[in-house]
């Protein structure tokens, strides 16, 4: 797999920007793409008439990655929560539609035989409208369990 060099990426961004100046109604989407998935759009539509606070549970069965992999290096990959978990935080914020006002995060404690604990976390977010949600980002789940699951409860 080839990696994009910074210069090449900047060139592509510049081309897209120049093209967008010539064309009307151009949308540029970067990074947080889960909110544009058809099921999420449908979910957002179904929630539109529910103005009461929401309770959300997201389970991410991320799968194990060896401890020596670059994604676990804070200087290179940033860790799995920075690199991937942030997408679920964005998705939850999108579904609630209000600012995050507080959070609590807990990682798995150190235990014999557990090489990486930072990829087994619970993140609870509190929102300005009273909603809350918990993201279970887990690298120790079974492969038969779905990779991503979202449950939303509201009146």
Set out the residue ranges of the language-model regions:
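Beta-strand-loop-alpha-helix segment that lines the small-molecule cofactor/substrate pocket
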Residues: 1-32
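Glycine-/small-residue-rich active-site loops that bind phosphorylated ligands and cofactors
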Residues: 2, 35, 140
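Residues that form or flank phosphate/diphosphate-binding pockets in enzymes
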Residues: 4-5, 38, 144-145
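Short helix-capping segments at alpha-helix termini
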Residues: 19-25, 49, 125-128
